[in-house]
Amino acid sequence: MAACHWIGAKGWAPATGGNMSLREDARWCWLSESGKDKGSLTTDDFLQVEIATNLAPSGRKPSAETGLHTLIYRLFPEANCVLHVHTVNATVLSRVEKSDALHLSGYEMQKSLAGQITHLDDVPVAIFDNDQDIDALAERIARHHRQFPLRYGFLLRGHGLTCWGSDVAVARRHLEGLEFLFECEMQRRLLERA
């Protein structure tokens, strides 16, 4: 719950936006319920969801992006936490960047991402066009991943950031690191225009 409350306090899940999940095992995950304020979530606000089917046995409504969480758990067996946020930086950068990835390079904080050991690497963060058809969106993401493996997270154009990690701490570090890098990139672009 602490990570959810931290996200809420940062304003990264405004107006009940965003969602979070934890893997229980190979079959199940726990996903935040739709329409809940992420800054005040309790354990009762998480629904058990079957990873293969996206179904919640309770009958309650899981997040609209359930299919993206379960996709990540299927693509990355080592992923045990998924965080989806609607930050200003992620939302705006994903709209102004016209290519299919936001390329980050030269930032020391790239090393906050698992496996990154230098600021000299190019770190591409894939950008997918937003789609209300989550099944179709998940299929596009899966196809992209087969050709260009995803790492850490991806952006949905005009929507936000989805990231993951081997546990809550790693997912949170990826979220915080990427958000910092996005803020740096926003500032860099603004200053270059001035």
UniProtKB/Swiss-Prot annotation:
<dbReference type="GO" id="GO:0046570">
    <property type="term" value="F:methylthioribulose 1-phosphate dehydratase activity"/>
</dbReference>
<protein>
    <recommendedName>
        <fullName>Methylthioribulose-1-phosphate dehydratase</fullName>
        <ecNumber>4.2.1.109</ecNumber>
    </recommendedName>
</protein>
<dbReference type="InterPro" id="IPR050197">
    <property type="entry name" value="Aldolase_class_II_sugar_metab"/>
</dbReference>
<dbReference type="InterPro" id="IPR001303">
    <property type="entry name" value="Aldolase_II/adducin_N"/>
</dbReference>
<comment type="function">
    <text>Catalyzes the dehydration of methylthioribulose-1-phosphate (MTRu-1-P) into 2,3-diketo-5-methylthiopentyl-1-phosphate (DK-MTP-1-P).</text>
</comment>
<dbReference type="GO" id="GO:0019509">
    <property type="term" value="P:L-methionine salvage from methylthioadenosine"/>
</dbReference>
<dbReference type="Pfam" id="PF00596">
    <property type="entry name" value="Aldolase_II"/>
</dbReference>
<keyword id="KW-0028">Amino-acid biosynthesis</keyword>
<dbReference type="GO" id="GO:0019323">
    <property type="term" value="P:pentose catabolic process"/>
</dbReference>
<keyword id="KW-0479">Metal-binding</keyword>
<keyword id="KW-0456">Lyase</keyword>
<dbReference type="GO" id="GO:0016832">
    <property type="term" value="F:aldehyde-lyase activity"/>
</dbReference>
<dbReference type="InterPro" id="IPR036409">
    <property type="entry name" value="Aldolase_II/adducin_N_sf"/>
</dbReference>
<dbReference type="InterPro" id="IPR017714">
    <property type="entry name" value="MethylthioRu-1-P_deHdtase_MtnB"/>
</dbReference>
<dbReference type="GO" id="GO:0008270">
    <property type="term" value="F:zinc ion binding"/>
</dbReference>
<comment type="similarity">
    <text>Belongs to the aldolase class II family. MtnB subfamily.</text>
</comment>
<dbReference type="GO" id="GO:0005829">
    <property type="term" value="C:cytosol"/>
</dbReference>
<comment type="pathway">
    <text>Amino-acid biosynthesis; L-methionine biosynthesis via salvage pathway; L-methionine from S-methyl-5-thio-alpha-D-ribose 1-phosphate: step 2/6.</text>
</comment>
<keyword id="KW-0862">Zinc</keyword>
<feature type="binding site">
    <location>
        <position position="84"/>
    </location>
    <ligand>
        <name>Zn(2+)</name>
    </ligand>
</feature>
<keyword id="KW-0486">Methionine biosynthesis</keyword>
<feature type="binding site">
    <location>
        <position position="86"/>
    </location>
    <ligand>
        <name>Zn(2+)</name>
    </ligand>
</feature>
